[in-house]
């Protein structure tokens, strides 16, 4: 008898990166003068954060390190800094109001595109142009295609306008986050001219520690991606454990 054929393809289950943090979970905003500049009052842990422990290819089961170790580190650091009776620092109320208004407008705006169609185009573009094996041509084309798809989000609207249990609205917010993440990923992959860890570049098959032993720092503003580098942390906190020297990953 004939059996149905099921396609088997690779897909994403982990992001090799995230919000830059130090080992205490404090969020960093790297600058040219200070690549370890701390954002006061903001912490991140788990798979959303990048504390420079995984390198370019996380080993299996090491997500527990993100969650358990750095989750605990965050709580300990917060308890050290924040004391009972401390006042919350003043914040930019106008910026907060702008963010709230932007998200509210998603409910009311009218458009000619739906979430599912844009999400599918984004998925196809990422699968084709930022898949397991990459090259300059694919990545450059991917940057252009994804930039166009990113702009289409402004034409997306939803039918459900309610404020309670609105799954359409949740999917719309998820799409915005996915587009942000995808655009940064595509630009960052095109930026890195080497092969390292999960980034396998056919035009640059070797690892290049001289030029690319660094994190890629990406800032996204209205669809424009600005990229820079941040040094990889190679120093240990104490003398009990020695730093592991660089070596080729072979099997």
Model-derived features with residue positions:
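Proline- and acidic/polar-enriched loop/turn elements at helix boundaries
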Residues: 6-7, 205
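Short Gly/Pro-enriched turn/cap motifs at secondary-structure boundaries
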Residues: 8-11, 16
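Glycine- and aromatic-enriched mobile tails/lids
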Residues: 14, 26-44, 48-251
């Amino acid at each position: 008898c004939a059996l149905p054929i099921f396609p088997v393809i690779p897909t994403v289950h982990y992001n090799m990166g995230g919000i830059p943090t130090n080992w205490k979970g404090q969020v960093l905003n790297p600058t040219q003068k200070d690549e370890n500049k701390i954002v006061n009052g903001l912490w991140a842990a788990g798979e959303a954060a990048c504390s420079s422990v995984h390198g370019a290819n996380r080993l299996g089961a090491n997500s527990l390190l993100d969650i358990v170790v750095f989750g605990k580190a965050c709580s300990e650091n917060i308890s050290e800094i924040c004391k009972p009776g401390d006042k919350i620092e003043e914040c930019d109320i106008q910026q907060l109001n702008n963010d709230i208004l932007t998200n509210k407008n998603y409910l009311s705006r009218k458009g000619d595109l739906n979430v599912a169609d844009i999400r599918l185009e984004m998925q196809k573009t990422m699968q084709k142009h930022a898949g397991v094996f990459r090259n300059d041509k694919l990545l450059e084309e991917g940057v252009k295609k994804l930039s166009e798809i990113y702009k289409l989000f402004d034409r997306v609207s939803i039918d459900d306008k309610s404020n309670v249990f609105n799954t359409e609205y949740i999917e719309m917010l998820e799409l915005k986050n996915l587009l942000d993440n995808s655009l940064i990923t595509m630009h960052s992959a095109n930026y890195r001219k080497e092969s390292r860890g999960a980034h396998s570049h056919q035009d640059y098959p070797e690892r290049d520690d001289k030029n690319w032993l660094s994190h890629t720092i990406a800032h996204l503003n209205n669809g424009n991606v600005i990229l820079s580098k941040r040094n990889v942390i190679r120093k240990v906190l104490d003398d009990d454990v020695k730093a592991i020297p660089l070596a080729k990953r072979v099997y």
